[in-house]
A protein has these predicted regions:
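A solvent-exposed, acidic/Ser-Thr-rich amphipathic alpha-helical stretch
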Residues: 34-129
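Short beta-strand segments enriched in hydrophobic/aromatic residues
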Residues: 28, 41, 127-129, 165-168
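Short, cysteine-centered beta-strand-loop-beta hairpins and adjacent loop/turn segments enriched
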Residues: 130-142, 171-174
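Extracellular/periplasmic carbohydrate-active domains that bind, remodel
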Residues: 89, 126-136, 227, 231-238
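Short beta-strand edge/turn micro-motifs at domain boundaries
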Residues: 120-124, 145-182
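Short, surface-exposed coil-to-beta transition loops
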Residues: 105-107, 142-149
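Short, low-complexity N-terminal intrinsically disordered segments enriched in polar/charged residues
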Residues: 1-35, 39-43
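A hydrophobic membrane-anchoring alpha-helix module
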Residues: 179-239
């Protein structure tokens, strides 16, 4: 049976974990993904970031992914400045950065388990998000419903991110049948320079979670945290 002190410490750990993920999605909302590794992840080299299509494994790979996202954001904002010179033409690069993309990822249904040894924790959230991107087809807003899963490790007395997994159950343009998620909007010449934007390929390419389609059968959510003593006795949200 846990003592009052241990229960208090676990309450503090739970609050810290919620705050970390709140900062994570806020960093994405503010297009500051390039700050995430240094501010929210642990200092270990074996961190990872997973999506439906695979994992970025290792500190360098994760940082390069986030930096590529920010570079793409800067290019999209510059493109909009050319298209709307009256509204955006006088903005500096710093003021302009982040104009266009909008990533709203509200977190809900929080559930976590902390290891009996107190050194690690696991948590899962549902996400009912709406993400606006600037593409070669212009601004496109997609529903992005799914899950955030994460492993945390204690470092210098505080919980830090170790492995993050963000999988989408639904990804489709707003106003489109979920069973027909294809983006069939025409390309627009004024946005053509955005066609060559590509993010780094995952370190490990695999289908981690299949997005909903008319041909997909019923899919279980990602495995939720279960009581465990040490991390060696449980599963990982990373690779």
């Amino acid at each position: 049976m846990l003592s009052t002190l241990q229960l208090t410490e676990r309450f503090e750990d739970s609050r810290e974990i919620k705050n970390i993920m709140g900062k994570y999605v806020t960093s994405c909302l503010l297009c500051r993904e390039d700050t995430i590794v240094d501010s929210l992840f642990c200092s270990r080299d074996d961190i990872s970031l997973g999506f439906n299509h695979g994992y970025y494994v290792g500190r360098q790979a994760v940082k390069e992914y986030y930096e590529a996202v920010c570079a793409a954001t800067a290019k999209k904002s510059k493109c909009l400045q050319k298209i709307f010179p009256e509204q955006l033409g006088k903005l500096s690069d710093e003021e302009l950065y982040g104009v266009g993309p909008f990533k709203a990822e509200p977190l809900t249904s929080f559930y976590m388990q902390e290891a009996e040894d107190g050194e690690t924790a696991k948590a899962i959230w549902m996400v009912e998000g709406s993400i606006t991107d600037i593409t070669e087809k212009g601004p496109v807003t997609n529903w992005s419903w799914g899950y955030y899963c994460a492993d945390f490790v204690r470092e210098d007395g505080h919980m830090k991110l170790w492995h993050v997994l963000r999988v989408e159950d639904v990804h489709c343009p707003n106003g489109v049948d979920w069973g027909m998620p294809e983006n069939n909007f025409p390309e627009l010449p004024e946005f053509s320079e955005l066609k060559d934007i590509k993010l780094p390929e995952p370190t490990v390419k695999e289908t981690v979670y299949e997005t909903y389609s008319a041909s997909r059968g019923p899919a279980k959510p990602p495995r939720g945290p279960e009581p465990y003593k040490t991390f060696a006795e449980t599963f990982s949200y990373g690779v």
